Amino acid sequence: MQGRAIWAEGPIHSFDLPSSSLERGGQALKSGASKTHAYMDEEVGTSTAEAWTWIVPSLSFIQGFMAGQAVLLMLFLGLFRYFFMTSSPGTRAQQQADLLQRVHAVRTSMDMRSHVPPYARVPYEQGVQACVQDLLSQVRYDPSEHAPESLDWLNVLVAQLLMSYRMSILNAGMCAGRNEDMDEPALPSTANAEKTAAKLALERVLNEAMQGRATKHFLDRLVVTDIDMGCRYPTFSHARVRPALHAKSTLVEIDFEYMDALTLGIDTRMWLHFPQWRFGSLAANLCMRVERFAGTLVLEIGTLPEPTPVQARVCLHPNFVLDAHLSTILGSKSKLQDVPKIEELFLARLRSWLEHNVVWPHFWHIPLPGIGTSPADPLA
């Protein structure tokens, strides 16, 4: 049979195959390989199609969900626009009618929810004097019959305020003392930690204030030699209400008294710049002590006859009492001590300053927070 090899013990004999048989065999192999590749391509295509069948439905669901939400939102906006909004403002009369309707509805609802008895007051258009009389009647205060009141509660508040100021001065001085070298002689102002802290704080304030004045060329650095911020507190009593002179408001008169030993001692040098710069200096040491300050304090809140912002005005009656003493030493070699004229001039200048700033008819104006004032207004 052709195409078969015969194996025997003897030598191997081969038969030659015709060329047509070889060609038919090669074509068979090629057709088998092409069928194999076609089958593999069919399998891959089937898996890819199955994957897309899972992806496409998920994308369609998200798109449909978003479209549904958009439709609901547009429907809600349309209904809101139709029921609660208007396309045009309308005429002025219609706007006013709508405003009155809204205000009436809100006012009616508020009256139904709250149960407040009706209050009546004098309209402001009747004048300030009528309003003041109405004010006194509402607070049940008759100035002609009401007895002076004690101010124990005010004494406690003022004492706490003064104590807070004293503690803040001491804290500021302690903070400044950490950065300064205390290589100074033993002075009365350094007798204890509190005086030392107050000395440092006051020296810093005084010397900084002297920098912007013309006297800085004539005065040397100020050294606080003695200081005592006191240990007592002022007392207020006999508060009474009085009508103001211009009949535009009322004022409160309060008697006060402060007895303590407020002490301040300063040492410096006064320079003479003639005929040359720093030709000579005059040493000066001053110590002032205030022992008693008493009088009548007047407090008035309101507006003046002319249109001004609301403010509080404070002044003293002219019969105030100020008991103070001043000790001085001038000179380095030959010293002038406790010259009476210097004490008289200094205390007279202090009293004159008080009379021209806080003694009636001069007031110390305290601006109060205003409504409707511009930020640029210094009194606002």
Curated annotation (Swiss-Prot):
Residues in the Lumenal compartment per record: 1-64
Listed GO CC annotations: endoplasmic reticulum membrane; ERMES complex
Keyword DNA repair: no
TM region(s), chain numbering: 65-85
Cytoplasmic side: 86-380
A GO MF label: lipid binding
Record's subcellular location: Endoplasmic reticulum membrane
Protein family: Belongs to the MMM1 family.
Name the UniProt record assigns to this protein: Maintenance of mitochondrial morphology protein 1
Phylogenetic classification of the source organism: Eukaryota, Fungi, Dikarya, Basidiomycota, Ustilaginomycotina
